[in-house]
C-alpha cells in the first residue's frame, strides 16, 4: 500500500495558497497506520536509540507508537506553556514573528541517542528548534524522521546543512 495515497490534501488551508497535507486520513486507516509505524521501526531497529522525541501534536501519535515498538521512552516537545514543571525552551522564526517549543529539563540525559519524529517537515523551523533542545540537554540527534517531506520548502535541506540526518517516508511537491 502506498501511504502517500492515504494522505488527504486540503487546498487553501489554513490560508490561501497552502496545500495542507492531512494525515488524519492515514491515521484512521489501520493498515496505513501500521505500515507507517512498521516502516519507521524497521529503519531504527538495531540502531542505538534511547528515546523518541515527538513534536506537538501529530508527532506524538506516531512517535509514541514507534517508541513503544522500539522499547524506549517517548518525550514530547510542546508549544510554549503546555508542559508543567521545569522546562527548557527555544524560540524559532515563523513567516511573521516567532514561536517557541519546550521540553522538560529532565527529559533527555547526557549522551542519549534520540530519534526526532514529526508528521511533516516544511521549512524546518520547529524540527531545528526541537533538535537544539535535545542537544542543549546533552542528547545526540540520531536522525530527524518525518512521515511527509515537502522538498520545495527546503526544511530537510536546511536540517542537513546544519548537520542533522533526515528521513521522510514520502514526499509531496508543491504541484501535487
Swiss-Prot record:
What keywords sit in the KW lines?
A: Cytoplasm, Glycosyltransferase, Purine salvage, Transferase
Keyword Glycosyltransferase appears in the UniProt entry: yes
> Biological process GO terms, please?
adenine salvage; AMP salvage; purine ribonucleoside salvage
Q: Which reaction does it catalyse?
A: AMP + diphosphate = 5-phospho-alpha-D-ribose 1-diphosphate + adenine
Gene Ontology cellular component terms for the protein in this record: cytoplasm
Question: Pfam families given for it?
Answer: Pribosyltran (PF00156)
What pathway or pathways are given for this protein in its record? Answer: Purine metabolism; AMP biosynthesis via salvage pathway; AMP from adenine: step 1/1
A GO molecular function assigned to this protein is: adenine phosphoribosyltransferase activity
Query: EC no.?
Result: 2.4.2.7
What SUPFAM superfamilies is this protein classified in? PRTase-like (SSF53271)
- Quaternary context: Homodimer.
Q: Which family does it belong to?
A: Belongs to the purine/pyrimidine phosphoribosyltransferase family.
Q: What does this protein do?
A: Catalyzes a salvage reaction resulting in the formation of AMP, that is energically less costly than de novo synthesis.
PANTHER family (alphabetical)? ADENINE PHOSPHORIBOSYLTRANSFERASE (PTHR11776), PHOSPHORIBOSYLTRANSFERASE DOMAIN-CONTAINING PROTEIN (PTHR11776:SF7)
What is the protein name given in its UniProt record?
Answer: Adenine phosphoribosyltransferase
Give the species: Methylobacillus flagellatus (strain ATCC 51484 / DSM 6875 / VKM B-1610 / KT)
Lineage runs: Bacteria, Pseudomonadati, Pseudomonadota, Betaproteobacteria, Nitrosomonadales
